[in-house]
Amino acid sequence: MAETQRRPRVYFDIQIGSQKAGRIALELVRLPFNDVVPKTAENFRALCTGEKGVGKQRKPLSYKGSIFHRVIKQFMIQGGDFTNFNGTGGESIYGEKFPDENFELKHDRPFLLSMANSGPGTNGSQFFITTVPTPHLDGKHVVFGEVINGKSIVRKIENMPTQADKPTTDVTIVDCGELSGEDYENATKQVADATGDPYEDYPDDHQGEELNAQVCFKIASELKNFGNTAFKSGDVALGLDKYQKGLRYLNEFPDPDENDPKDLEPQMKSLRFTLHSNSSLLANKLGQYKNAQNWATYALEVADAANAKEADRAKAYYRRAVAYSGQKEEDEALKDLQEALKLAPGDAGILNEIAKVKKAIKDSEAKEKAAARKFFS
């Protein structure tokens, strides 16, 4: 098939804060033999390449350097305002606005590309990517493409902290353009990240073999190893991401069915314990003490079912104790350390932490007494 007969494919290279996040590849609905919304698709394609030069607002007609200015979880991520960066600007290659072509395509699934507008016939450059089906937008917004790769990046943006629906950290399109040749052909291929992880961040977005308990266990086991690799290389945040991703896949099928191997259930429970406990370890290192406390608690809750070894239970108690200490809850920390010591008698790390916690309690009591004396003097 000649290149001109194929649907255009374009890309966004995304940066979150100062960190590269990766590439989102999109396919546009514009075919000579299926001419659905050619004008809308051409507008987006040209704004990706920047080939139209400068617009009427004396700004480059290009998405390069613009941000995703509006993000609503379980709805969509929105960008394309390359003039004001806040949802009030942007313009099309045809002028400030152009009419709705048609509403033939529906918002019936996540990862669809659709035009943002401020009412009928007000299409400019702003667009959004759905993260769930949004049928209430049918007949109001023009769908003209879809994400074909980089869905994990869309999910990462969707789940970012926001203030008044704007990400608290800038999500920038640092480069964009049209794909051709080998890049076009490879646009749909899932590329492994630096750890070797080829899987989508969320099971709902998984493509390939059908998910079941055995497949999810296999993927979660691999993700544990990817997390270990990241942690050993010094990337604590990435390691934590992999452990949490593994739990998402395990939670997709929390219990095997009757046709699965008999040893699958205990293996799944053991893996769940490990992923929670490892998550607690890394969260402590990142100063996420409340999360670390919760994940250690989850590990201890499944310890019996997972048939966890005493040494591993001791680690979970120790990690929760560190989390309590980080939140200045020394009394709770001391209780957990004493439980850990019962399971791992004489452990130097536990004994050192007990000494630190007891000193913190003693120092706190001394401060309280000094404050009381000063108050009554």
UniProtKB/Swiss-Prot annotation:
It is found in: Cytoplasm. Keywords: Cytoplasm, Isomerase, Repeat, Rotamase, TPR repeat. One of its GO terms (biological process) is protein folding. It holds the Pfam family Pro_isomerase. The keyword Lipid biosynthesis does not apply. Its EC number is 5.2.1.8. TPR repeats lie at residues 220-253, 273-306, 314-347. GO terms for molecular function: cyclosporin A binding; peptidyl-prolyl cis-trans isomerase activity; ribosome binding; unfolded protein binding. GO terms for cellular component: cytoplasm; intracellular membrane-bounded organelle. PROSITE patterns: CSA_PPIASE_1, CSA_PPIASE_2, TPR, TPR_REGION. It catalyses: [protein]-peptidylproline (omega=180) = [protein]-peptidylproline (omega=0). The keyword Coiled coil does not apply. Signal peptide: none annotated. Gene3D superfamilies: Cyclophilin-like, Tetratricopeptide repeat domain. Residues 11-178 form the PPIase cyclophilin-type domain. Belongs to the cyclophilin-type PPIase family. PPIase D subfamily. PPIases accelerate the folding of proteins. It catalyzes the cis-trans isomerization of proline imidic peptide bonds in oligopeptides. PANTHER family: PEPTIDYL-PROLYL CIS-TRANS ISOMERASE (PTHR11071), PEPTIDYL-PROLYL CIS-TRANS ISOMERASE D-RELATED (PTHR11071:SF561). This is Peptidyl-prolyl cis-trans isomerase D.
